[in-house]
Amino acid sequence: MPRLMGVDIPNDKQIQYSLTYLYGLGLYRAREVCEKLGIDPTSPASDISDEDVGRIAALLERDYLVEGPLRRQVTQNISRMREIKSYRGIRHRVSLPVRGQRTKTNARTRKGPRKTVAGKKGVKDLR
């Protein structure tokens, strides 16, 4: 099982799908990496040599933001938005959806479990 950027890459899958286990690398970029290095994207990950693994790692380090550095950049961007108190930063701060979704109903994942409010007493008496 090859290891790239601290992530175990599955042996039994094609290299193009194995590379998508890295954070920040989707199928398009995985194929792009294989094409740049002249590796057949449909070959199993178990068939690539240690030299190829080294070449892939070097290319990813040099040309792409993946794994730790990408996670760090995303976190820094969010904290910067919170710091300058932009609309998106405020939404992040109060744990509400950031991209314009409705919140009257739904948004439960972001808002957390429902906070139940007791009903009014005496409503039945009015009928």
From Swiss-Prot:
Pfam families: Ribosomal_S13 (PF00416). InterPro entries: Rbsml_uS13_C, Ribosomal_uS13, Ribosomal_uS13-like_H2TH, Ribosomal_uS13_bac-type, Ribosomal_uS13_CS. The keyword Ribosomal protein applies. GO terms for cellular component: cytosol; small ribosomal subunit. GO terms for molecular function: rRNA binding; structural constituent of ribosome; tRNA binding. Residues 97-127 are annotated as: Disordered. Residues 101-118 have a biased composition (Basic residues). It comes from the Bacteria. The keyword Ribonucleoprotein applies. Keywords: Ribonucleoprotein, Ribosomal protein, RNA-binding, rRNA-binding, tRNA-binding. GO terms for biological process: translation. Belongs to the universal ribosomal protein uS13 family. Located at the top of the head of the 30S subunit, it contacts several helices of the 16S rRNA. In the 70S ribosome it contacts the 23S rRNA (bridge B1a) and protein L5 of the 50S subunit (bridge B1b), connecting the 2 subunits; these bridges are implicated in subunit movement. Contacts the tRNAs in the A and P-sites. Part of the 30S ribosomal subunit. Forms a loose heterodimer with protein S19. Forms two bridges to the 50S subunit in the 70S ribosome. NCBIfam families: uS13_bact. This is Small ribosomal subunit protein uS13. It comes from Rhodopirellula baltica (strain DSM 10527 / NCIMB 13988 / SH1).
